[in-house]
Amino acid sequence: MPLQAIDLNSDVGESFGNYTLGLDEQVIPLISSANIACGYHAGDPAVMRHTVALAIKNGVGLGAHPGLPDLVGFGRRNMEVTLEEIKDFVTYQIGALQAVAALQGARLQHVKPHGALYNMAVKNPAIWDAVAEVMAGIDERLILFVMAGSDRAELESIAKRRGV
């Protein structure tokens, strides 16, 4: 029987500017993959750099955690946006974190949308499709992380069609 493992995953890198949020220094050594905020709902370039370095030091898989451009609402407020805007938001954030990781000799492993973007996608599969399209265009090796209890068959179909 093959060895099975559970991926312990956490949202991290959500501090920005002078504001420290979360317990990244304590949490990251305990997890196997990290969803790192990419600047729209939380995080900033310095926090992203520090969080990536901490994850690498602890052998933790790097993931982009793109959200809607909503610092005030922490990315938890729904917005009326088009699929093209969602693609732009996700492209920008994955690209930023991908560059931060590359400068430290690492690559991204996964993408897990944040907050309202995730919740909007649960209700609208076209949003999942838009996210998967961007992921495939950036790096087909990226894994789309979703919450337990999601419609697995539908999400697998979208991911397979998009090549992620």
Regions found by a protein language model. Give the residues of each.
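Charged helix-capping and loop-helix junction motifs
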Residues: 124-130
